[in-house]
Amino acid sequence: MIDPNLLRNNLAEVAEKLKVKRNFMLDTEKLTALEDQRKNLQVTTENLQAERNARSKAIGAAKARGEDIAPLLAEMDDMGNQLTEAKAQLDAVLAEINQIALSIPNLPADEVPLGKDDTENKEILRWGTPRTFDFEVKDHVTLGEEANGLDFAAGAKLTGARFAVMKGQIAKMHRALAQFMLDLHTEQHGYLETYVPYLVNHATLYGTGQLPKFGEDLFHTLALQGEQPYALIPTAEVPVTNLVRDVIIDEAELPIKMTAHTPCFRSEAGSYGRDTRGLIRMHQFDKVEMVQIVDPDKSMEALEELTGHAEKVLQLLNLPYRKVLLCTGDMGFGSCKTYDLEVWVPAQNTYREISSCSNMWDFQARRMQARCKAKGDKKTHLVHTLNGSGLAVGRTLVAVLENYQNADGSITVPEVLRPYMGGLDVIGK
């Protein structure tokens, strides 16, 4: 949620930025009308409350003098009814303003390039050189099936499309990748490992911005009797970031760096017909997520650090990748600046997204009321939150299988993974 003071004091400027940079049309007339109503009702309730307090004192004085206070009590009751009605109207207006505010995307940072879609993203760097093969390249589906380690038919039988079963050495490599990532982030990058629920409530989803706008992208549970409804997490960013919801953090404890390995569940609404073959776009996939809670003055610096942590995974696996700064038209709803890392996928002869690292500024913190303050200081201020994939495990498996394949269909195990696989150096044939 963007700063409400910006909407009150710089509405026209904010609306223009949202139109140009986000292709988002803010209904300024409606918002202005609601703001006028809010101000009027605020004054009305404050005046009624002040008058009611004054009348209450007058009743006390009249009673002490032995006067008949029945007429005064009747006036108080009437004033109380007026106050209750005015407060209800004010609450309704505030709720409507809040619903509009929840639908507004974050404002991009000034350095984010203007653009309509991913064709206008800005490439920052490339690392590594794509391998030249002297044999016909197989895709990860063929490699995995030939190794008897990927079974999409079983996934479809058990559940449906966009699900897979992994077995044997492929399943072991998938697990090894996640363990390697967690160890790297906790032992070298300073993150605290967390284990979090895979089901979250709606307040949690509002906190990080999935609701109310992206409800169709989630898998929702039916509420049991006496229970609130839940949704499966689309990313560990949701529960991990919400650990600081409604918390006032001592500034001395910042930055807070947390990581988690979880399955992620996405409906992939709007992705019909895209990446229907293989592990690239699944309803269920594993990801190691990194989250940072930082001082507002240090969030851009933290974004560079966090992105570097994701890059380190790719570098240690010796997987060629490129780093891309997303343009305004390709950014996520809550982000003010995002880098994507795209790994080389030989069978597709292109780079594919494997990590997205974002500075959310105070957008999520305002929704969550996640604040910090210096020791001895009474005033609090919102923290900044960042998140990034470090990495998507299934897509990393895709990249390893295809980049490390051999002519006989076997796959060489990257050196950094061998300790996690009992010293195994080749899988497959």
From Swiss-Prot:
Fetch the Gene3D superfamilies from UniProt: Bira Bifunctional Protein, Domain 2, Serine-tRNA synthetase, tRNA binding domain
According to UniProt, this protein's pathway is:
Aminoacyl-tRNA biosynthesis; selenocysteinyl-tRNA(Sec) biosynthesis; L-seryl-tRNA(Sec) from L-serine and tRNA(Sec): step 1/1
Residues that, per the record, bind ATP: R266, S267, E268, E353, I354, S355, S356
Recorded catalytic reaction(s): these are: tRNA(Ser) + L-serine + ATP = L-seryl-tRNA(Ser) + AMP + diphosphate + H(+); tRNA(Sec) + L-serine + ATP = L-seryl-tRNA(Sec) + AMP + diphosphate + H(+)
Q: Which GO terms describe its molecular function?
A: ATP binding; serine-tRNA ligase activity
> What Enzyme Commission number does this protein have?
6.1.1.11
* NADP keyword on record: no
Q: Name one GO cellular component term.
A: cytoplasm
* Keyword Phosphoprotein (UniProt): no
Record-listed L-serine binding positions: T235, A236, E237, E289, S389
A GO BP annotation: selenocysteine biosynthetic process
Protein localization:
Cytoplasm
Xref: InterPro entries: aa-tRNA-synt_IIb, aa-tRNA-synth_II, aa-tRNA-synth_II/BPL/LPL, Ser-tRNA-ligase_type_1, Ser-tRNA-synth_1_N, SerRS_1_N_sf, SerRS_core, tRNA-bd_arm
Task: Please describe the quaternary structure of this protein.
Answer: Homodimer. The tRNA molecule binds across the dimer.
Q: Which family does it belong to?
A: Belongs to the class-II aminoacyl-tRNA synthetase family. Type-1 seryl-tRNA synthetase subfamily.
Q: What is its biological role?
A: Catalyzes the attachment of serine to tRNA(Ser). Is also able to aminoacylate tRNA(Sec) with serine, to form the misacylated tRNA L-seryl-tRNA(Sec), which will be further converted into selenocysteinyl-tRNA(Sec).
Q: What is this protein called?
A: Serine--tRNA ligase
Gene encoding it? serS
